[in-house]
């Protein structure tokens, strides 16, 4: 009898453990509501009305665990159309929830709502969410934190505390008016008036000392800083005076840890760093600074945002402490940018393998850069000349979004003929010396063109920067996938030489990669996610000018390899 009871208890115990493991693995459903509403905000002594989520700027933090299902209801109370992109989420078979307007959905109109329903599969780390229509993401953005599954440790020392820090840009003017003026005149856009940490410009701007982000820390602790570059148009250097940072993650993918004093993030990128505080209380406070990296032509916001790292003390006041200020690289320090980027390597461990495709089915070569459109008749423009407007393109195709339906919807119902074409060029139609003397003709062609891929195609894509209207870096973001960065360099990509030096062992895995200024980058990915997926420069004005394209990934043969149908509350155009 005793033996039977013990056996029964043992079986029950093992069943409970198994059930808990399965439950932890399966995840839970988490519900959020985003109310899109107007809010008066004062920065730099100027009060203006901005579009927010739930009246917060930046917006609320979304937290989940790997394996969780997220159902986020977005209710639009403002006259602006809106859609939300969950930047970096794979959206496996849930492309209807990806968010870019007129790509995977029509925007949510005033008085309408839409539930973004997706499951976080095989991902953990720092991501973010933002509006994906016009320049609405200037104020509509926030962190998306994916914690590991229960009882799964980090592959680095457990931090005492985790702190998201979002980099942003503040415009005294309405960002929508800024981009509309630029597109109408053909000129570059007016620059922002400040950079921000978590919405605060800090003490280096006029009338801004009270709006300073402070990070309060204790001595002898390790903090995980979740850095997110949500700026519209600026790549940013970041540093903390007298403190070394250990990089442990990029774009929600763990990396081999390395130490640095300065972090560079392009728009759209995230980087997790460990900050180990000093062992005893220092008689000082420390500036955190961020300012742009830029090599292109035109006007940018070359100002510096400052926050304060302050040590807590139960008796001492910080009022009379000196503030130590760090230094940052010059604005055009491409050498630092390149060396920093090369430091990133995947863990490539048994727990977190680097599944880089070794065999490639399809190869593509995309020339990325600026260009021009002709000025409309009887109008004087302010582009490179008074007869041209600024534009941008991939393989000389400047992308035009549809406005009466979405690419995904037209594809799903089999009515894409009058919406997009499938003849996107796999390489430049007219090759040229991409990083040398630019061609005399800088005019781009315009169209809505995509590349079609069969399910599970392995893709190698070389992204080549160009010198047309100036060389500059381009942070390229791919929706729906992560990719491996197998190679990068300066000058023109050499197909006979450069692939021999690819890293196919531990290349970094990302969703957004900087094409070096005057250089190239090679990526590989597996097209295992059916749907329509945007790929674009995350410098917002370049996206507005057409530096984007889309991949259509066809369904596979099995039921779990097919795109699910759209939800019942899917927004209508």
From Swiss-Prot:
GO CC annotation, single: apoplast
Keywords: Apoplast, Copper, Glycoprotein, Lignin degradation, Metal-binding, Oxidoreductase, Repeat, Secreted, Signal
Cofactors: Cu cation
Domain Plastocyanin-like span(s) in chain numbering: 35-151, 161-314, 423-557
Glycosylation sites noted in the Swiss-Prot or TrEMBL record: 40, 81, 117, 190, 206, 242, 283, 302, 320, 332, 339, 378, 386, 396, 403, 433, 440
Reactions catalysed: 4 hydroquinone + O2 = 4 benzosemiquinone + 2 H2O
UniProt binding sites for Cu cation 1: 85, 477
Database matches in Pfam families: Cu-oxidase, Cu-oxidase_2, Cu-oxidase_3
Highest taxon listed in the record's lineage: Eukaryota
Induction summary: By NaCl and 20% PEG.
Protein's recorded name: Laccase-2
Gene that this polypeptide is encoded by: LAC2
């Amino acid at each position: 009898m005793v033996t039977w009871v013990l056996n029964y208890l043992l079986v029950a115990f093992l069943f409970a453990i198994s059930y808990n493991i399965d439950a932890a693995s399966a995840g839970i459903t988490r519900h959020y509501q985003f109310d899109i509403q107007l809010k008066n905000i004062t920065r730099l002594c100027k009060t203006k009305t901005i579009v927010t989520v739930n009246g917060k700027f930046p917006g609320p933090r979304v937290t989940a665990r790997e394996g969780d299902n997220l159902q986020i209801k977005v209710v639009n109370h403002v006259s602006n159309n809106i859609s939300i992109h969950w930047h970096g989420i794979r959206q496996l078979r849930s492309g209807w929830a990806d968010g870019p307007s007129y790509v995977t959905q029509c925007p949510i109109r005033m008085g309408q709502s839409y539930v973004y329903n997706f499951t976080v599969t095989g991902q953990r780390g720092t991501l973010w969410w933002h509006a994906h229509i016009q320049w609405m993401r200037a104020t509509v953005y926030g962190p998306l934190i994916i914690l590991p599954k229960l009882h799964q440790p980090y592959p680095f020392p457990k931090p005492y505390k985790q702190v998201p820090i979002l980099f942003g840009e503040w415009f005294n003017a309405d960002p929508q008016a800024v981009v509309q003026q630029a597109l109408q005149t053909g000129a570059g856009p007016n620059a922002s008036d400040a950079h921000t940490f978590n919405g605060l410009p800090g003490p280096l701007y006029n009338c801004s000392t009270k709006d300073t982000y402070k990070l309060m820390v204790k001595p002898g602790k390790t903090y995980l800083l979740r850095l997110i570059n949500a700026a519209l148009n600026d790549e940013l250097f970041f540093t903390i005076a007298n403190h070394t940072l250990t990089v442990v993650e990029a774009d929600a993918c763990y990396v081999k840890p390395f130490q640095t004093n300065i972090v560079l993030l392009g728009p759209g990128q995230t980087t997790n760093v460990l900050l180990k505080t000093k062992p005893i209380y220092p008689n000082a406070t420390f500036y955190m600074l961020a300012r742009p990296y830029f090599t292109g032509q035109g006007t940018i916001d070359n100002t510096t945002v400052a926050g304060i790292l302050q040590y807590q003390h139960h008796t001492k006041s910080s009022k009379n402490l000196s503030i130590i200020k760090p230094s940052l690289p010059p604005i055009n320090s491409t050498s630092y940018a390149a060396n920093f980027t090369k430091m990133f390597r995947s863990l490539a461990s048994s727990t977190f393998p680097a599944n880089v495709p070794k065999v490639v089915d399809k190869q593509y070569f995309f020339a990325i850069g600026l260009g021009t459109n002709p000025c409309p008749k009887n109008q004087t423009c302010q582009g490179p000349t008074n007869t041209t407007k600024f534009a941008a393109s991939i393989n000389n195709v400047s992308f035009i979004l549809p406005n009466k339906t979405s690419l995904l919807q037209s594809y799903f119902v089999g009515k894409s003929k009058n919406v997009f074409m499938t003849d996107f060029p796999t390489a430049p139609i007219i090759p040229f010396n991409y990083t040398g003397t630019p061609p005399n003709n800088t005019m781009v062609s315009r169209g809505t063109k995509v590349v079609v891929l069969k399910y599970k195609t392995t893709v190698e894509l070389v992204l080549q920067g160009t010198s047309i209207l100036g060389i500059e870096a381009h942070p390229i973001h791919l929706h729906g996938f992560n990719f491996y960065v197998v190679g990068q360099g300066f000058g023109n990509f050499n197909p006979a030489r450069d692939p021999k030096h690819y890293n196919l062992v531990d290349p970094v895995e990302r969703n957004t990669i900087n094409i070096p200024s005057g250089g190239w980058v090679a990526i590989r990915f597996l097209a295992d996610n059916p749907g329509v997926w945007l790929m674009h420069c995350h410098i917002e004005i370049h996206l507005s000018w057409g530096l984007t394209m889309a991949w259509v990934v066809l369904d596979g043969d099995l039921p779990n390899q097919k795109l699910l149908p759209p939800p019942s509350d899917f927004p209508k155009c």
